Amino acid sequence: MHDKVVSSSSLLPNAQAWQNILAKFVLLFFGIALWMKWMSMSAGFIVALVWILDNGHRRLGQIIKEPLVLAILILCAALALGILWGDYPESGRLKWRRYFALLVFIPFLSLLNKDRLPWAIGGLVSGYAIVLMIGIYQCVIAGEQGIPPLDISYLTFSSMLGIGIIISIYLAGESNHKKIKSALWFLTLLLLYVQFNQHGRGPLVATLLGSGLLIFLRYKSEKKVLLSIAVCFIITAVAFAYSGGLYQRLAQVQTDIELSQQGKYDTSLGYRFAVWDVGLHGIAEKPLFGHGTGVPEGYFEKTVMTYKGGIYKDLPKYMETSHYHNDWIEIGMHLGAFGLLVFAFLLRSWFQTLKAHSLSIPGAALVCFIFISGLTDTFALYTKVVTFLLVITAVAIVWQKKNMGEKTWEYKRVGIF
């Protein structure tokens, strides 16, 4: 009898050890899998499952104290509520469901602690490095935009590069080791060069503005250093602009504008003008609570036939419309002013979370990047990039807790619920 009790009691620590190993592996795996279209969704479900096995749901009351966690829950609840006054589509691409991918932040953050942090960082860096190498090959050797083998568009790849640039600049400023600092600045230049060779104008502008804000905030008290870095950054950007054919793309923008003035909207910029116009018209129709979750996907093609005498009626042949190429118009179409407030609260909470952990400078730069990117595309629907940002945020939070000697969330069998 005594032997059975001893044997049973020894099983619990052993089970917890295996559970910890499983959590480490999943954190490592997720950082790599989030870039793979055929694995990212499954990886998210695996993270959630391991979180439940790790009794993460018992720590939800602690995790929800982070402003970003609360904001994500509010946004997803608002979208779910919006189905009640929307006409749920029987068919369609249902891209709005991608907003719910934000929820993966909760189990990922809850699984992290000081012991598991290196595994999460390893997965994050490994995944980024693998995708970056494939992307550089596609850009420099194959002459392709984006990363076709991984089904990553040039906009997603450009956004990924932009985030890497901002993080590299910040880490270079924080590092006290000359070799590491030099390596990070070299990485920044490499990423910037590749980004200038991508056709994504919006992510590039967001990167330059976000990086500029970061440099200003980081070195504003060191005027000579600030001026030196700013001059070097501008010279580098101009040099890369020439080599990357940016001026040809700017000339294309002017051509698109001229064609739009002639009533020809079947161009990249002209199509966006049309989508924004119809989207703003849709918001004006139902300004308070929008058309309901899911309805805007089919709204464009129905409306263009008669709107403004049908000047956009041929655009469905040019491109199938499933979103409005602007975060604010997109959420406004779904949920109106209510949705706009919720989305603004999300961005504010993202910054507040990073600020609370002494990361206000990179927080301001990243939120600036998200905001600017969302003006020309539905950045919030770029699942891979947004998930990548959330993983960075989670890692940064736990890293800061570790450095400041703060406790992370307790991993006990008995939780608060």
Task: Give the residues covered by each predicted segment.
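Transmembrane signal-anchor hairpin modules in multi-pass inner-membrane enzymes, especially those
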Residues: 1-84, 91, 110-122, 171-182, ...
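Alpha-helical transmembrane segments of multi-pass inner-membrane proteins
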Residues: 48, 112-143, 152-219, 241-242, ...
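Transmembrane alpha-helices of multi-pass inner-membrane enzymes
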Residues: 48-49, 343, 363-375, 379-417
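Perimembrane helix-loop-helix junctions
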Residues: 52-60, 207-229
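Aromatic-anchored transmembrane helix interface
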Residues: 68-76, 89-112, 128, 151-163
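A membrane-periplasm/extracellular boundary helix in multi-pass inner-membrane enzymes
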Residues: 197, 218-262, 277-285, 293
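Hydrophobic transmembrane alpha-helices and their immediate junctions
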Residues: 225, 333-368
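Long extracytoplasmic/lumenal interhelical loops at the membrane interface
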Residues: 264-270, 274-277, 285, 289-335
